[in-house]
C-alpha cells in the first residue's frame, strides 16, 4: 500500500523534492555530487562503487526512486538548499510497513554540505511529514564507526535501541560491521522529543 507523502517538503533552509520525473540532467547532477564525495561516501555506502557514470544514477532514478514512489516501496527525496536550489544530498523513507505503521530513513550528503546541520534539518522535515500522515515509528540505522551519521538521529531525539553486532558486510574494509538501531515513536514526536 502506498504512503501518501507530499512531492515537496520545506523547512527553514532545505527543501526535499521528489526526484521525478527522471531526467538525464538530474542524473548527471546527482552523479556529480556522488563523484565529488566518492572517497567519503564509499566508506559507508556499498552502491557508490557501482556508480561510475551518470547513466548509473539515471537507472536508480527510473528503476529505484520512481518505481518505489509508484509502488510505495520507498520515497526518495533530493535535499536542496532552499535559497540556491543546489543539490546537497538524498534522503529516503523506505521499508514502509502499512501493518506496523513504520518505516526507515536513510540518507547521504555531499562532502561540501557536511557539518552545517542540513541533514538534521532534512530528517526532522521528513519525520514531521511522515508522522503527520500516520506513521507510528521511524528507524534510522547507522554504522557504529560513522560518527557523523550517528550524530544525526542523536540530535533529532531518536532513542538508541541497540546495536546489531557484525550484522553488515563492509566490502571496503572486508569485514562485518556493527550497526546502531535508532528509533523515534509518534508519541515522542508529539511531545517534541
Residue positions per predicted region:
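Generic, well-ordered alpha-helical segments
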Residues: 33, 53-57, 71
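A short helix-loop-beta-strand connector motif used in the catalytic cores of GNAT acetyltransferases and
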Residues: 50-51, 62-77
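Sparse recognition of residues in long alpha-helices and their boundaries
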Residues: 46, 57, 73-74, 169
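Acyl-donor (CoA/ACP) binding surface of acyl/acetyltransferases
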Residues: 1-29, 33-40, 76-193
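Conserved GNAT-fold acetyl-CoA-binding loop/helix
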Residues: 39-63
Amino acid at each position: 500500500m502506498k504512503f501518501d507523502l507530499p512531492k515537496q517538503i520545506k523547512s527553514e533552509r532545505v527543501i526535499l523534492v521528489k526526484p521525478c520525473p527522471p531526467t538525464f540532467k538530474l542524473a548527471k547532477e546527482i552523479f556529480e555530487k556522488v563523484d565529488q564525495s566518492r572517497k567519503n561516501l564509499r566508506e559507508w555506502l556499498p552502491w557508490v562503487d557501482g556508480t561510475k557514470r551518470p547513466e548509473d544514477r539515471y537507472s536508480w532514478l527510473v528503476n529505484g526512486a520512481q518505481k518505489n514512489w509508484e509502488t510505495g516501496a520507498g520515497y526518495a527525496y533530493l535535499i536542496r538548499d532552499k535559497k540556491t536550489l543546489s543539490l546537497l544530498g538524498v534522503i529516503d523513507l523506505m521499508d514502509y510497513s502499512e501493518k506496523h505503521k513504520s518505516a526507515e530513513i536513510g540518507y547521504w550528503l555531499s562532502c561540501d554540505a557536511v557539518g552545517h546541520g542540513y541533514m538534521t534539518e532534512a530528517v526532522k522535515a521528513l519525520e514531521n511529514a511522515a508522522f503527520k500522515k500516520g506513521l507510528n515509528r521511524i528507524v534510522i540505522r547507522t554504522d557504529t564507526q560513522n560518527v557523523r551519521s550517528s550524530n544525526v538521529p542523536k540530535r533529532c531525539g531518536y532513542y538508541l535501541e541497540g546495536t546489531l553486532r557484525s550484522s553488515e558486510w563492509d566490502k571496503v574494509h572486508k569485514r562485518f560491521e556493527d550497526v546502531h538501531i535508532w528509533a523515534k515513536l509518534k508519541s515522542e514526536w508529539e511531545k517534541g522529543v
